[in-house]
Design a protein with these regions (language model features):
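Transmembrane alpha-helices and immediately adjacent membrane-cytoplasm interface residues
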Residues: 56-82
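TPR-repeat structural position
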Residues: 85-86, 122, 159-160, 194, ...
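Structural motif corresponding to the intra-repeat A-B loop/turn of tetratricopeptide repeats
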Residues: 82, 119, 156-157, 191, ...
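Start-of-helix register in tetratricopeptide repeats
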Residues: 70, 103-107, 140-144, 179, ...
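Short coil turns that delineate tetratricopeptide repeat
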Residues: 100-103, 137-140, 175, 209, ...
């Protein structure tokens, strides 16, 4: 992971991420408990139901581990990209609660902040983000953190120039992430740089088709930018496209 990056992950859990020793101990305990459960489960099934159930128990343990490690993060990301923020937040919360490493937990918590902001709860997102020490994050996590801080600032009427400075740092780290470029364009509109914003928004599709939810917001931002430039016809075209994509 980290989770999906956009204008967008409990504050108490995030605060603990500052203390690697405590986090490491928690993750070691979780991993040991999981290994123990996967080992004891088949043995107990065999003792109660007979030897054939040992193999069934092993298969179930492998399947459950795959569900936790692979399926759950992928479906959380997919729910976010489909704008199903409540579902995505529940899955990220479960990932964080069962994470075996500090990085996996941080990524899930950052993604939960994204869900909160995208769902219209920027104050909740801000509380989570404030619990992180930015200097302790790796590059991918820092991109998510910077992006989400910029989005919260824009969504709460903060200084658009400060939001732009945050997102420019994220772009310098990961210029290839369309959702980060979308945040950059939103900040450019907020500071009145409409031509620059249009250029960024148009370039977002250079790498291929976007997820429908992201394409819809891209079109809405293009409509806003063209409105500001006094081009209502262009703006109307992009609003129509946004409605079509969002269906």
């Amino acid at each position: 992971m980290p989770g999906p990056v956009r204008c967008w992950f409990s504050a108490g859990a995030a605060a603990d991420l500052r203390y690697p020793g405590r986090v490491a101990a928690r993750h070691v305990a979780r991993g040991a408990a999981w290994v123990l459960a996967c080992g004891l489960g088949p043995a107990l099934l065999g003792a109660v139901l007979g030897r054939p159930w040992i193999a069934i128990g092993v298969v179930l343990a492998i399947a459950t581990t795959g569900w936790l490690v692979l399926w759950l993060p992928r479906t959380a990301h997919a729910a976010f990209e489909a704008a199903r923020y409540a579902r995505a937040a529940r899955r990220y919360r479960l990932i964080a609660a069962t994470a075996f490493t500090a990085g996996r937990e941080r990524a899930a918590v950052l993604s939960r902040a994204g869900c909160d902001d995208a769902a219209g709860r920027p104050a909740a997102a801000e509380r989570i983000l404030a619990g992180f020490d930015a200097g302790a994050l790796d590059a991918a996590e820092r991109v998510t953190w910077l992006n989400n801080r910029a989005c919260v600032a824009l969504d709460t009427g903060g200084d658009p120039g400060a939001a732009l400075a945050l997102i420019e740092q994220a772009v310098a780290l990961r210029p290839d992430v369309p959702a980060v470029q979308h945040t950059r364009a939103t900040a450019l509109i907020a500071v009145g740089r409409f031509d620059d914003a249009i250029g960024v928004l148009e370039a977002m599709r250079a790498g291929g088709e976007l997820a429908p939810a992201l394409e819809a917001v891209r079109c809405r931002e293009l409509a806003r930018a063209w409105d500001h430039k006094g081009q209502p016809d262009y703006a109307a075209d992009y609003r129509d496209r946004a409605r079509l994509v969002a269906r």
